[in-house]
């Protein structure tokens, strides 16, 4: 056989071999995971923490879920009150559209934002983070973005299951439209909150209700079916969610209450994204939902939506909500606020 033909045959054989190998699951060796040196000391401290020992434990009764909820709300409320005090933000409970909300106002509302309004949908895997604890992300946005924010304290199981939370978000949005132009408003949230914000867009669009001028989608829980590379690559590396076997997966299914989790109102990545408002998405390189964020960003772009993606070094799931003194936290919200400023009318 001529030398050139032999080389071609060898390359073909190697190609077939590699293709066959790539079709199989890969096993990677155990290795240490260093804390990066080029992030803030605050983020380094978060990155270095071990995963919670009880990450794979969750209640198996409605009473157990309710107790977990009360405990989470109590600790989250303390965090929110202290954060609002540090950042000079006022938080006032009120009702919009029959739903309990909190009006979150910075001490230094930007002149350009006087007629603008943001609506925030809280995180918590659909079952945690209610009450005044629901205001943490709104407080950060108010302080660092200089916007007035309405934090939606939507209903959660075991008191109310899918689609109650979605109904509440849409009800607040429709109420907000009575006093503000849709182009003057944005909706944002993290994790389950981001998924609910997207689902609210589908519901509003289907009902002929105007959509906001922009969206902020932080580490969105966009796919409950388990699709996504980072569910494997960041398992046990993300020290917040930890893995799909952790708390958040059963919590989301508890909310779904037997409903098909591939429904776009639960897994919005499978919905029709065309015509949605401009969106900014946020994640971290260690986030278990990094792939959900990246895949959603690509699908938004493929659907003709103006979408921007920011990914932060070494962050696990939504760690920008955990320390208001970190420069990365300020940067996350300043980037989102800048995006909103470009897309909202005044």
PLM feature spans:
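Bacterial N-terminal signal peptides
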Residues: 9-19
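Bacterial N-terminal signal peptides that target proteins for export
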Residues: 1-9
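Short linear motifs in intrinsically disordered
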Residues: 79-85
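Short, basic/low-complexity N-terminal boundary segments at the transition from targeting/disordered tails
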Residues: 63-78
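Intrinsically disordered/low-complexity terminal segments and short unstructured peptides
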Residues: 9, 60, 76-78, 89
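Alpha/beta-hydrolase superfamily serine-hydrolase fold, recognizing
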Residues: 24-65, 85-346
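Conserved, well-structured beta-alpha core segment at the onset of a catalytic domain
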Residues: 5, 17, 197
């Amino acid at each position: 056989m001529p030398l050139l033909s032999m080389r071609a045959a060898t390359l073909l054989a190697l190609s077939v071999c590699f293709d066959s190998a790539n079709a199989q699951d890969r096993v990677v060796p155990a290795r240490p995971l260093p804390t990066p040196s080029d992030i803030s000391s605050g983020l380094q401290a978060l990155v270095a923490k071990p995963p919670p020992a009880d990450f794979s434990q969750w209640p198996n009764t409605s009473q157990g879920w309710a107790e977990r909820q009360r405990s989470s709300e109590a600790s989250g409320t303390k965090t929110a009150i202290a954060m609002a005090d540090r950042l000079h933000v006022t938080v006032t409970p009120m009702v919009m559209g029959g739903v309990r909300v909190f009006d979150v106002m910075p001490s230094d509302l930007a002149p350009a934002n006087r007629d603008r309004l943001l609506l925030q949908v809280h995180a918590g895997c659909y079952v945690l983070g209610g009450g005044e604890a629901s205001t943490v992300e709104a407080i950060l946005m108010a302080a660092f973005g200089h916007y007035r924010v309405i934090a939606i304290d939507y209903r959660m199981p075991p008191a109310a299951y899918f689609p109650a939370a979605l109904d509440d978000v849409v009800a607040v949005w429709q109420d907000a439209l009575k006093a503000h132009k849709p182009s003057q408003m944005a909706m944002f949230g993290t994790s389950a909150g981001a998924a609910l914000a997207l689902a609210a867009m589908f519901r509003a669009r289907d009902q002929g209700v105007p959509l906001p001028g922009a969206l902020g989608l932080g580490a969105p829980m966009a796919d409950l079916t388990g699709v996504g590379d980072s569910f494997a690559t960041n398992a046990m590396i993300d020290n917040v969610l930890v893995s799909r076997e952790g708390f958040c997966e059963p919590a989301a299914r508890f909310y779904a209450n037997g409903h098909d989790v591939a429904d776009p109102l639960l897994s919005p990545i499978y919905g029709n994204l065309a015509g949605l408002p401009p969106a900014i998405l946020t994640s971290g390189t260690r986030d278990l939902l990094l792939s959900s964020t990246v895949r959603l960003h690509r699908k938004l772009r493929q659907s003709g939506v103006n979408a921007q993606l920011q990914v932060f070094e070494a962050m696990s799931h939504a760690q920008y909500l955990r320390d208001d003194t970190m420069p990365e936290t300020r940067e996350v919200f300043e980037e989102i606020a800048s995006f909103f400023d470009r897309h909202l009318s005044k």
